[in-house]
């Protein structure tokens, strides 16, 4: 059986269960050729599970999948790649000691040239075509998170994918890196690529997508044209009820100073500086948020404060009942 080829992908009545848990229930999803479709939903709504079936990681219990007008059976990532589908996951699958270009050609079927200069040239041309900023000869362990993501995207493009799935691609990016990624995605769309972005960030959905498909608790709620919707409507479709996006926060009455971090510096497990002269104070009766993209030192900060991670400079002091006592001594009762 076949369906209209104007759709790059059609998923009909797809269901996936894990034991007694239903991750996706009778889901219908359509991706048009040459569009950017946002797949929107709360955490746990089944977005990634649905796309894992399209990329061959999971196999649906029920339902049909059509790619470029033909019904297909996708039992593995190899089947998915053969259909021109490539998925970029949240957690990168790169070999740190290899270069960008080496990672991109790693695992390719057939005869692959071992001429590094030729490989670097081809990867560089592909990166330039879509507007990526990447040195093909750079080792992965020297790359930023954004550069590693670029390598993952180029990997699927190099294999010939024209249907791309990006799982929470901006979760680890700065606002500037996010805007650069969106520019690249628009260039890919102009080149005829069909793109699905899994996300729950409403502002980014409205900025980059052509249409928005919404999942809620594993079920398909509907699809809307991005130009005809707003954050309020999308939120209601995600949650199932109207939600006020305006938060009225009362003024906090701070108590005594409880924690003082002074010029704290530490290295991560790879010997790279994770914290560099970090200073702040926390007061009783308040909730202090620590913000930053993944890998910015939040984990090392919390573990150092708790005495689980050594510092190479600075101090962490408990203030209050025993003013000026190091936190580690306070925890140990010294």
What are the residue ranges of the model-derived segments?
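Glycine-rich phosphate-binding loops of nucleotide-dependent enzymes
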Residues: 2-334
């Amino acid at each position: 059986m076949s369906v209209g080829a104007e759709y790059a992908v059609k998923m009909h009545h797809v269901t996936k269960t894990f034991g007694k848990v239903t991750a996706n229930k009778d889901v219908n999803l359509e991706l048009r050729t040459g569009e950017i479709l946002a797949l929107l939903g709360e955490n746990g709504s089944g977005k990634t599970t649905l796309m894992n079936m399209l990329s061959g990681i999971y196999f649906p219990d029920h339902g049909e999948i059509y790619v470029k007008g033909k019904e297909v059976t996708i039992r593995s990532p190899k089947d998915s790649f053969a259909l021109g589908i490539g998925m970029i996951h949240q957690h990168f699958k790169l070999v740190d000691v290899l270069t960008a270009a080496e990672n991109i050609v790693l695992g390719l079927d057939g005869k692959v040239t071992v001429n590094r200069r030729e490989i670097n040239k081809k990867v560089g041309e592909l990166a330039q075509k879509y507007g990526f900023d990447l040195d093909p000869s750079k080792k992965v362990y020297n790359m930023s998170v954004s550069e590693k993501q670029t390598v993952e995207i180029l990997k699927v493009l190099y294999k010939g994918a024209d249907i791309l799935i990006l799982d929470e691609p901006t979760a680890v990016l700065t606002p500037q890196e996010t805007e650069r990624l969106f520019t690249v995605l628009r260039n890919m769309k102009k080149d005829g690529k069909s793109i699905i972005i899994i996300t729950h960030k409403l502002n980014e959905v409205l900025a980059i997508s052509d249409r928005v498909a919404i999942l809620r608790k594993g079920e398909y709620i509907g699809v809307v044209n991005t130009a005809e919707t707003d954050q309020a409507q999308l939120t209601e479709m995600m949650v199932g009820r109207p939600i006020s996006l305006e938060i009225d926060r009362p003024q906090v009455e701070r108590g005594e100073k409880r924690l003082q971090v002074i010029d704290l510096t530490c290295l991560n497990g790879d010997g790279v500086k994770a914290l560099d002269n970090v200073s702040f104070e926390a007061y009783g009766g308040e909730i202090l948020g620590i913000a930053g993209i993944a890998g910015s030192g939040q984990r090392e900060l919390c573990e150092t404060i708790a005495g689980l991670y050594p510092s190479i400079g600075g101090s962490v002091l408990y203030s209050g009942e025993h003013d000026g006592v190091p936190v580690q001594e306070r925890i140990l009762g010294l």
